[in-house]
Amino acid sequence: MEAIDGSLFTAKHAGGYAWWDFIKNLRQIRDDGSSLAIPSDSPGHWTAALSAGSRLRLAYDVDLSFAEKLRNGDLRGGLLLGDSLYLVNRALFVMTNASGPKNIEFDLPPSFMIATPWTEIAERHFRAGDNRELTENWTIFGRFPVVGFNQRNLQVTFAFPGVSDYEESLLKPLFEPVLHEYLRIFPQTPATHLFFAFFHGAEDNGEGFLNSTTLTTSDPISPKNRILWTNLLAHEIFHHWNGGLLVPAEDEKTSWFSEGVTEYMANRTISRTGLISTELFLRKLEAHVAMYDYWMWAPPFQKTTLEGAGGDKDFNRPAVYSGGVVAAFCLDTKIQTQTGGSRTLEDLLQLMMQRYGLTGKQWGSDNLVRDASEVTGVDLSDFFRRYIRNREVLPVKTCLGDAGFDAALSDYAGEPFITLQEHPSLTARSIRARLRGRNAR
């Protein structure tokens, strides 16, 4: 490897892992083939003896026993999954201060596959742009299912280490309709290649890396819990656009939008594409309305607004996610009623993509108010002032009624019941039809 000095180091402590603990027997290989042990001079750091500008040849072992046991947070480190091994690359590499690309070559059994976001430059030979791209991603080795998607400028690779053949058969039909729908919503999507790993872990969780994303579920993948895993995958994929390309300048103030709009669009998408029934979509919407209503009513949350909830996303999860869904639904419905159905929340997202996603600019709360008002054709600052920046309860019944649904709500008990209106207005019928999609069942 290239070296500008004798400094050697691993990635910094992250995800509950001290990566240097896994590096064993680090040694420098001399020109004559002999080796010289390099002792650690501090956690995660060694110093090799060499002249400036020299190339350095190292050998070391990596103790992967940490990946043998299921544990919370294993998606941030590694996990052995039957015939495959998922590893966050921080566990593998000792680095130098030399800048520039890093070439990686693997010597593996011929039957083994490799999935990684690094650029493949030859068979089993890859290139990472720098130390960060080298380590802040994952690699999967072994035998595992892979699903690919390639349309227009978007290429996506989904890897499923440890997933059974039956589970694979359930997962595969999800990706194409979801991604087609997202590309329809964002036709301006710039060229990119996304990498997702999805497997059974100790918890239901997700972790984003530099060029890759990992999702884990603690439950089996089955038709009975389809709403859970379809929602999880559709939600995290949508974050490529909302949160990945549309980057907020004030994350704490806009978490309700980043998470709530993402959750709303994910649920709407799996309903519109026929992956779940309208009944399941309504049950999911009921759950979000229930959590939002309870959050608005319960004493521990009385001093928090939707805008302020992002300051403690875990504690205020009912606001950030469920409240965000209700706000997104009401905003979508308001845009459609004000424009006679000619504009929707999609138009707002497309405008934001044009102004921020494609320019690299971040957006703030004031930008959102301005953009939403522009799309709707009326000033929506009062909507954001009352329901987002202050604690006035969103008009859930009105929003649902405008979309062709009846609702019975009991705020203090968190018990909403949503049903289809028997005789909706023409406007409500069209809003409901757009929500349910062609493939609604």
What are these model-predicted stretches?
Residues W19-I29, D63, R90-A91, S99-T116, ...:
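Zn2+-dependent metallopeptidase catalytic core
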Residues P145-T254:
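Juxtacatalytic substrate-recognition/specificity segment
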Residues A3-G15:
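Ligand-binding face of N-terminal immunoglobulin V-set domains in extracellular IgSF glycoproteins
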Residues A14, A59-F141:
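Extended, low-hydrophobicity, Ser/Thr/Pro/Gly-biased non-transmembrane segments
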Residues A298-R370, V378-S381, Y387-L394:
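Pan-zinc metallopeptidase signature
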Residues Y17-R76:
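A surface-exposed beta-strand-loop module
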Residues E250-V325, Q338, Q354-T359:
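Acidic/His/Gly-enriched intrinsically disordered linker/tail segments
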Residues M1, G357-R441:
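Beta/coil-rich, acidic/histidine-enriched accessory regions frequently appended to metallopeptidases
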